[in-house]
Amino acid sequence: MKKILCPTDFSGTATKAVKFASEIAQQAGAHLTLIHVVHLPIVDTSETALVASELLGEQMRDASDKLKQLCSQLEETYGANRESNFTCDFVLKEALLTDVTEHLTKHEGYDLIVMGTTGCDSTMEELLIGSNTEAVIEEVNCPVLSVPGTAEWQGVNKIIYATDYAPGDKEALEKVVELGSVFGADIDVVHVVKEASPEAAAKAESFWLELQQKYTGVPLHFQEIVSKRADEGLKDYFKRENGSILAVLRKEKGFLQNLFSQSLAEKMTYQAEVPLLVLQGHK
């Protein structure tokens, strides 16, 4: 892992994401790039266009000052007097966030995006942050770690990967193992079934044997759990096992509306309770 992106609007939620991104970058010896975007409002007269242009210029200058200060603080905190290659820069654009992140991940070789997301009792501004996170996940071909505004950094000790035995699971697990190795974290591969059966047990055993053969020496564990609802089963397992990050595979557009169930999509985005790492399947 060499390069990490982290969008910020300087809100409390974004600050949490910057904390997570900085800790991961410091531990991995990676470069961190902060992103901030501004939008020129739609105008219908030359007079309002002039006012809007002046406002945009003011916003850009203010954001640039904040980004410079934040990068300086992060380099002082995470780069100074540590055995780390941590460095930080920023991108400031008048553009849509999805356009900027898609371009950077496609052309600049970024390995991970870290973004803030919010809970169901959020303000409208905070809900827009959650909406941006979902939009970025849908557009980029890069892992995205969404960090709830309520999350506190406690290291990465255990990553829980939710599998449904999709063809892309094994490739996605490579990214999970890569992140886990940075922290020496355990990785639990978890499959949820509504009820136990010999067929399910046989499929689970076959899948687990494949993983054991591929990931020798990796602290990888497999667990099949029984729950009528996948979202509740995963959440309970995550809490019981003191998970640090829940990882899932995005297989198609709109996956956040179809991931296991509608309720899981809701709980893991706008009502997020845990850091969620979304791995991208083939587009």
What are these regions (language model features)?
Residues 1-54, 158-224, 240-243, 271, ...:
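Small/aliphatic-rich secondary-structure junction motif
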Residues 13, 122, 168, 230, ...:
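Short glycine-rich, flexible loops that bind phosphorylated cofactors or substrates
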Residues 53-66:
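A short acidic, glycine-rich active-site loop
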Residues 63-81:
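N-terminal Rossmann-like dinucleotide/flavin-binding domain of flavoprotein oxidoreductases
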Residues 78-89, 215-221:
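A short helix-to-beta-strand connector/capping loop
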Residues 87-100, 228-231:
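Charged docking surfaces used in two-component/phosphorelay signaling
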Residues 99-152, 240-283:
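Gly/Ser-rich helix-loop-strand patches that form or flank binding pockets
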Residues 134, 177, 209, 235, ...:
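Active-site phosphate/pyrophosphate- and oxyanion-stabilizing loops and adjacent acidic/basic residues
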